[in-house]
Amino acid sequence: MARRALTTTAAMLTATAALLLTACGGGDSPSDDIKGADSGSSSPSASASASPAAPVVKRPVIKLPSSFQLTFENWTSSDPVEQAVLNDGKEQLRAGYAAIIENDPDSKARAFYDTEAGFSQSQQWIKSYTDKNLTVFGKLPVYDPKVSLAKNKAAAALSYCTDESKGYTRNRKTGEVKGNPAGTDPEVFYLISMAKNAQGVWQAVSARSERGGCS
């Protein structure tokens, strides 16, 4: 399951900072402050008012075969916004591998969790398997998730690691099985730029990876 590294760790950290600065506007705009924090107001009517309940979004049902075990370790946060990022980031990755296994680069489930630009990148990744008649099987742990939220909490950077040491590809036509080449680091670091859409779904805008970047 070896994949080409796309960038370096230093570049990833720079990209994360740039993402969050852009989302915050790079300044201290009053619109980003907590409402009422310096107004001195404690009006019951103000505190009682609540924004309308967010509409329930029907998310796609994503199924993976038992032959491919994609597990997520410590995928929880006490912060509800961070947890929402983790939840949708998890489903985005599951949808990608489901698309590979189903030989479907145009996966609607993956498109649901991607922006238009993000889905274009996802399709290239999926086709790097499907164009070669490859599917995946085995075990792929996903671990060490970290979420960095923009000040306005409408953009985020999600990073995590995967361990491909027990993940394999199989050629659909010949049955040939391949794992990581000898001497290849099985751990891959990922950095996903995410944005919340109008329906409240956290979508991937872009993704970068570095093999061996988890140590």
Region spans (language model):
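Bacterial signal peptide processing site
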Residues: 25-28
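Post-signal peptide N-terminal segment of mature Sec-exported envelope proteins
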Residues: 34-60
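Bacterial N-terminal signal peptides that target proteins for export
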Residues: 1-13
